[in-house]
């Protein structure tokens, strides 16, 4: 049995990963701002606001200290929580909007990954961290200066972390995984923005109208299959590789 720790697990991709991991017989710690009505004997829900970094650090350390690692053949952290807003051109977002965005999309996953690595330094089982990224990490979009740059930063953290872990006797394996366009609440937020703020809005509206958005269940299954087969440390994976 393995243990999965998943952020942003109350909806969308995070919830799909959690439910499928439970179906496979694994235990899940689900982190989100709001708890869901999902009940399972192997599911533990934690109400954590990752934008509040100091509080999140304390709560996550408490969670990690409660884990008996000897019970698991592998432990995986999936940094899934994120936001696309502010959808605005550079120069138009407020300080508060930028702080919230980068704290959730970049600083929080870096912080949680560090805490995870320290806590399980002597653990000899399989240790994995997955950072959910986006094609926006490589491709600029007008109106997504914050989102593109935060995901690009997260990908470089993945690459650097993997490079550093080559020096470790019991390394943590970290990857980034780009799920592509999914039928989630984030896509609804994108479609509700304006042409002025987001130049590519019509493309994303068309993806929805033509049924081209992939389901979170499909993406979750693909990711879990990849993790079962094994991954290359520091690599950026894209869903397009598995279609």
From Swiss-Prot:
InterPro entries: Biopterin_syn/organic_redct, NAD(P)-bd_dom_sf, Sc_DH/Rdtase_CS, SDR_fam. Keywords: Cytoplasm, NADP, Oxidoreductase. It is found in: Cytoplasm. PROSITE patterns: ADH_SHORT (PS00061). NADP(+) binds at residues 6, 80, 147, 151, 184. The active site is at 147 (proton acceptor). Pfam families: adh_short. CDD domains: SPR-like_SDR_c (cd05367). Signal peptide: none annotated. It catalyses: (S)-benzoin + NADP(+) = benzil + NADPH + H(+). GO terms for biological process: tetrahydrobiopterin biosynthetic process. It is an enzyme of class 1 (oxidoreductase). GO terms for cellular component: cytoplasm. GO terms for molecular function: benzil reductase [(S)-benzoin-forming] activity; sepiapterin reductase (NADP+) activity. Belongs to the short-chain dehydrogenases/reductases (SDR) family. Reduces benzil stereospecifically to (S)-benzoin. This is Benzil reductase ((S)-benzoin forming). It comes from Bacillus subtilis (strain 168). The lineage of its organism: Bacteria, Bacillati, Bacillota, Bacilli, Bacillales.
């Amino acid at each position: 049995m393995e243990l999965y720790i998943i952020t942003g697990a109350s909806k969308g991709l995070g919830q799909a990963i959690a439910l499928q991991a439970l179906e496979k017989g694994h235990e899940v710690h689900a982190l989100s701002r709001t708890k869901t009505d999902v009940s399972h004997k192997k599911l533990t829900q934690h109400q954590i606001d990752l934008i509040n970094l100091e509080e999140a650090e304390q709560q996550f350390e408490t969670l990690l200290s409660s884990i008996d690692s000897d019970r698991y053949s592998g432990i995986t952290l999936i940094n899934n929580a994120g936001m696309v807003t502010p959808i605005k051109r550079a120069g138009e977002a407020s300080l508060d909007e930028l702080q919230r965005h980068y704290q959730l999309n970049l600083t929080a996953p870096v912080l949680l990954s560090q805490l995870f690595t320290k806590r399980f330094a002597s653990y000899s089982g399989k240790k994995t961290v997955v950072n959910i990224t986006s094609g926006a990490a490589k491709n600029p979009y007008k109106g997504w200066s914050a989102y593109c740059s935060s995901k690009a930063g997260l990908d470089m953290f993945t690459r650097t972390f993997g490079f550093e872990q080559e020096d470790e006797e019991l390394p943590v394996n970290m990857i980034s995984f780009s799920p592509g366009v999914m039928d989630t609440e984030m896509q609804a937020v994108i479609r509700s923005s304006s042409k002025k703020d987001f130049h590519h809005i019509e493309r994303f509206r068309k993806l929805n109208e033509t049924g081209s958005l992939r389901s979170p269940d499909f993406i979750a299954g693909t990711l879990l299959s990849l993790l079962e087969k094994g991954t290359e440390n520091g690599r950026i994976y894209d869903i397009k590789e598995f279609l």
